[in-house]
């Protein structure tokens, strides 16, 4: 700083030795997910390498005869598979190594083959669709045949038919999150359930809780007693500073 540019009213602060990090205190806690600032801190201490957990490898696919991937012809009664792209983005943000296995048809043999391939090549598996009670919903059945179903159906909407368990194949095992096929249910069950479990599997010591806001709804909200419901809506700031919700 040029002395001529320093005025009498300006506060000039000298850096103090040890003000960023005191001797004897850990620079970073075990289980912390490394962020860009953490890498800079390590570099400032002359540390080029630190022991870390291996990236979690997650395989995922969608199930359904009606699903088409982007670029394929959309036949009558079919829809484009959006869930895989949603899961791809959420898993990438989480820092996982991902294996996109595409769309699997509603066929028990095809589903078993996909489960076995995923189990032998990943730490965890995420599927979307096939966990309800329809005639072509084979995910829960296949989970039971290849391993166990820890739980199926939860007191939450959207996302009630979610299934969770562990499957085995040729000496390998993997946790399996069977998410519903509804796109909103996929995001809700991933964010509130699967994401927390995956972070724990990564070795993260602290899982950040989702931000909570107290808002006033502009319309009546009905829900079944004992069931947690997540509503989509738009938040707006009122003239009095209160936050309101419209769905």
Spell out what each predicted region is.
Residues 65-66, 130-133, 181:
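Short glycine-rich anion-binding loops that position phosphate/pyrophosphate groups of nucleotides
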């Amino acid at each position: 700083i040029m002395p001529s540019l320093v005025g009498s009213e300006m506060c000039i602060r000298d850096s103090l030795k040890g003000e960023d990090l005191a001797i004897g205190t850990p620079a970073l806690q075990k289980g912390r997910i490394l962020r860009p600032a953490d890498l800079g801190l390590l570099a400032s201490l002359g540390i080029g390498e630190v022991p870390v957990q291996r990236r979690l490898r997650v395989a995922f696919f969608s199930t359904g005869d009606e699903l088409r991937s982007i670029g394929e012809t959309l036949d009558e009664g079919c829809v484009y598979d959006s869930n895989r792209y949603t899961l791809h983005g959420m898993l990438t943000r989480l820092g996982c190594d991902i294996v996109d296995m595409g769309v699997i048809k509603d066929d028990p043999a095809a589903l078993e083959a996909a489960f076995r391939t995923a189990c032998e090549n990943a730490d965890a598996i995420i599927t979307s669709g096939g966990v309800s009670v329809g005639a072509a919903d084979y995910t829960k059945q296949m989970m039971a045949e290849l391993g166990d179903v820890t739980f199926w159906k939860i007191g939450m909407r959207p996302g009630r038919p979610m299934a969770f368990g562990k499957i085995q194949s040729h000496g390998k095992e993997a946790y399996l999150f069977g998410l519903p096929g509804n796109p909103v249910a996929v995001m809700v069950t991933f964010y509130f359930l699967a994401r927390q479990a995956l972070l724990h599997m990564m070795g993260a010591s602290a899982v950040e809780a989702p931000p909570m806001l107290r808002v006033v709804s502009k319309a009546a909200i009905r829900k079944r007693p004992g069931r947690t419901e997540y509503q989509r809506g738009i938040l707006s700031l009122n003239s009095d500073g209160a936050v309101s919700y419209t769905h």
